[in-house]
Amino acid sequence: MAVISMKQLLEAGVHFGHQTRRWNPKMKKYIFTERNGIYIIDLQKTVKKVDEAYNFLKQVSEDGGQVLFVGTKKQAQESVKSEAERAGQFYINQRWLGGLLTNYKTISKRIKRISEIEKMEEDGLFEVLPKKEVVELKKEYDRLIKFLGGIRDMKSMPQALFVVDPRKERNAIAEARKLNIPIVGIVDTNCDPDEIDYVIPANDDAIRAVKLLTAKMADAILEGQQGVSNEEVAAEQNIDLDEKEKSEETEATEATEE
């Protein structure tokens, strides 16, 4: 059974592409028809592609991997942040800083600065420093949180990227491709699908469409985590689940005989 229905996609407006004069011919295979100068996306293909992306991210999660959600356009910012947080993943929803992946050593120093400023405040330094200096530190902190808060706990490279609008996030995609990080993307009719490993042909401009698809990808990660957590709990407690079941069956039999 598909993880998303045609009805859900239609209600969210996922089928509306861009104007026919603004399109990428490589998206032709995902287009159903044209109506009033707008391309209509083939939702049967979207359903199939959502399944593929879902299963991929679920597997990444089952293997203990992390996913970086990227969506800096206004229509995507809130969904990317809330859904990444819900799934316990990382996100960038403001500006993509150059070298965020390819020069992570430098970026990680800036992330470390967030904790440094927090510690300064906790230790009471803000109370003894000149007011002007405290104001500057707070400005610096707010700026760092705005751009890097979503990756402050990212200690290593993500195992996958989820991107809303590859045209808008071309820098993120270029860095991920350079590092051979697989990319899942919501790809509208004006984008190049060849840059994306798992294409989800869909409207990337409607908030409801972006929210629906981003939430589905978060669901995939959460489902994968459930598989991991069950196995980890069993391993940590050194419990053979089959043996436990046999033991319970034996106890039940003995109780019946008594």
UniProtKB/Swiss-Prot annotation:
Keyword Ribonucleoprotein set for record: yes
Keyword Ribonucleoprotein: yes
Keywords recorded for this protein, A-Z: Ribonucleoprotein, Ribosomal protein
Lineage top rank: taxon: Bacteria
Classification via InterPro entries: Ribosomal_uS2, Ribosomal_uS2_bac/mit/plastid, Ribosomal_uS2_CS, Ribosomal_uS2_flav_dom_sf
Pfam (any one): Ribosomal_S2
A molecular-function term among this protein's GO annotations: structural constituent of ribosome
GO CC, alphabetical: cytosolic small ribosomal subunit
One record GO biological process: translation
Residues covered by region (Disordered): 226-258
NCBIfam families: rpsB_bact
Family assignment from sequence similarity: Belongs to the universal ribosomal protein uS2 family.
Listed name of the protein: Small ribosomal subunit protein uS2
Species annotation: Staphylococcus aureus (strain COL)
Gene: rpsB
